[in-house]
A protein has these predicted regions:
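Ferredoxin-reductase
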Residues: 2-89, 144-146, 173-174, 286
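Reductase modules of NAD(P)H-dependent flavoproteins
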Residues: 2-4, 78, 137, 141, ...
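Short, conserved phosphate/pyrophosphate- and ester-handling motifs at nucleotide-, phospho-/glycolipid
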Residues: 34, 118, 210
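Conserved S-adenosyl-L-methionine
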Residues: 107, 131-138
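Conserved beta-strand elements of the Class I
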Residues: 110-113, 206
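Histidine-anchored nucleotide/phosphate-binding helix
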Residues: 119-131
Length: 286
């Protein structure tokens, strides 16, 4: 992990109140798809007081010539100044961090489960898979409140047509007073995952979403009893204490507590959205 000087190249709205930010890729910066960075806004950054650091998953694939993050924009002391910053504004990047890389077992399927802006690490992975043209089974279950809030929706639909073996399962769970939607509206649960992954060869599972989604998913995995014991944690927030496996798998920056639920390590947040990653074969019988 290194520290790099960079600058903002530009930004764009990719969904309602959701922006992608593009940064100059520093010389020598290398990362694995699914990893994240810590983005520091310098002391002279316009509009920023003391809130200068956030962790973000990288959206771009390693072969791309710029670094991209995406985030929901709220009126915070960090995000609002970032949204209003002009191209060319200097920033500092520390990273890469995190271990959400794909397993090196091409005979096993990949199941990704994303809630909202949790799609970001999977965009990096899918773009990399498409560039490498690796024909292995990949299923992405992607949940949002409404279509207009779904980041990278059009790109994901295009990837489904382009990437051999990739299947996209979309669900919009709050369709009142929204755009018309004829697709799935259930929350992602064990039954939906079973339906989407039926017949896949010994899949590995990756989950990225908010605390309530993490809690929903850990219970059925624990009940299945066949989840491999490797869980990784990534958290874009402030420092806290971790211990045991969680500390060994990730730098200790988080505002949540690690608990045990049904014998599986789960996470239950207090503020900020979080990413929780589980790797295993919960419904495959492996």
């Amino acid at each position: 992990m290194g520290k790099y000087d960079s600058k903002l190249l530009g930004s764009e709205e990719i969904a309602r109140a959701t922006f992608a930010f593009h940064f100059e890729k520093p010389a020598g910066f290398q990362f694995t798809p699914g990893q994240s960075i810590n983005l520091f806004l310098p002391e002279d950054f316009p509009g920023v007081s003391d809130d200068r650091q956030r962790a973000f998953s990288l959206v771009n694939a390693p072969h791309e010539d710029r670094l991209t993050i995406a985030t929901r924009i709220r009126k915070s002391a960090y995000k609002q100044p970032l949204k209003e910053a002009a191209p060319g504004t200097a920033v500092q990047i520390v990273g890469p961090t995190g271990s959400m890389s794909l397993h090196d077992e091409p005979d096993r399927a990949i199941v990704m489960i994303a809630g909202g802006i949790g799609i970001t690490p999977f965009m990096s992975i899918l773009r990399s898979e498409a560039q490498a043209d690796r024909p292995r089974p990949v299923v992405l279950l992607y949940s949002n409140s409404r279509p207009e809030n779904a980041a990278y929706l059009d790109e994901l639909r295009a990837l489904e047509q382009r990437l051999n073996g990739f299947r996209l399962v979309l669900t919009m769970t709050e369709m009142k007073e929204s755009d018309r939607w004829k697709g799935e509206t259930r929350r992602i649960d064990a039954d939906m995952v079973k339906e989407a992954t039926s017949g896949l060869p010994r899949p590995h599972y990756y989950v990225a979403g908010a605390p309530d989604m993490a809690e929903d998913m850990t219970a059925p995995w624990g009940a299945a009893g066949s989840l491999a014991p490797r869980w990784l944690f990534q958290q874009p927030a402030r420092e806290c204490g971790l211990s045991g496996r969680a500390l060994r798998t990730r730098a200790a920056i988080c505002p949540f507590q690690i608990t045990e639920k049904n014998g599986i390590t789960g996470s239950f947040g207090v503020g900020y959205w979080q990413i929780v990653v589980g790797v295993g074969s919960a419904w495959s019988g492996a």
